[in-house]
Amino acid sequence: MTTGNRDMKNPYYRALYPLYNPAAEKHWIAVAGLKKGSKAGSYELIKNFNEAGQGKWWTVAAPGNGIYSSTTDDHGNPGYASWGGTSMAAPHVAGAMGVLMSRYDQMNALQVRDVMFTTANHKNADGTNMEGWTDVDGTVRKDGEVSDRMGWGVPDLDKGMYGPGQFLGKFEYNMAKAGSLDVWSNDISNVALDQRKAEDDAWMKA
């Protein structure tokens, strides 16, 4: 589900659906759009697209500018053209999920989604934060936390090959069914759970 292209601090209502029906959250992925930055190897959130906002816990970001894709013209004739929008970003995330589901064929979709979320990246090639990672209020989220503009960050298939980065709930994985040794070398933290609890507690007190 895409966040939308309306320059808003929150996603379009369809991407924000789990806010109103929390049971849907585990089945949801929202996608925001990125573009290349002015420096080589840098990326930034596209400012006239909707941000993660209140949907940040199920949002990731992906390239959504200058994407060469199949299209149709006003008469329905097929062709190819360069397009921009969160609809161009979403297929990147669907592809990332497909790769990770192939890698972890004994996991269910929720577990694979959690791997994608908790191994997402928000760094440029030089190690600096992508523009748009900093929260609206100026808070710079640390590694493993979730931004109210970019969500979890950008799916990182390299890191995603080595297991989850955090456990967001009960997580069972049957190694015997996997059929062979499976090495998970990512450090496991709980910083996102701590962040969410702190934010939920603050909201309840407000």
Regions found by a protein language model. Give the residues of each.
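Active-site neighborhood of phospho(di)ester-bond hydrolases with catalytic His/Asp-centered motifs
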Residues: 1-4, 31
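Residue-level detector of functionally special positions within alpha-helical transmembrane segments
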Residues: 4, 85-87, 151, 156
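Conserved nucleotide-binding/hydrolysis micro-motifs of P-loop NTPases
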Residues: 6-8, 36-37
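Basic, gly/Ser/Thr/Pro-rich low-complexity segments located predominantly at protein N termini
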Residues: 9, 90, 100, 156-158
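Surface-exposed intrinsically disordered loops and tails
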Residues: 9-23, 40-48, 71-78, 123-147, ...
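C-terminal subdomain of the subtilisin-like protease fold in secreted/lumenal serine endopeptidases
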Residues: 28-30, 102-205
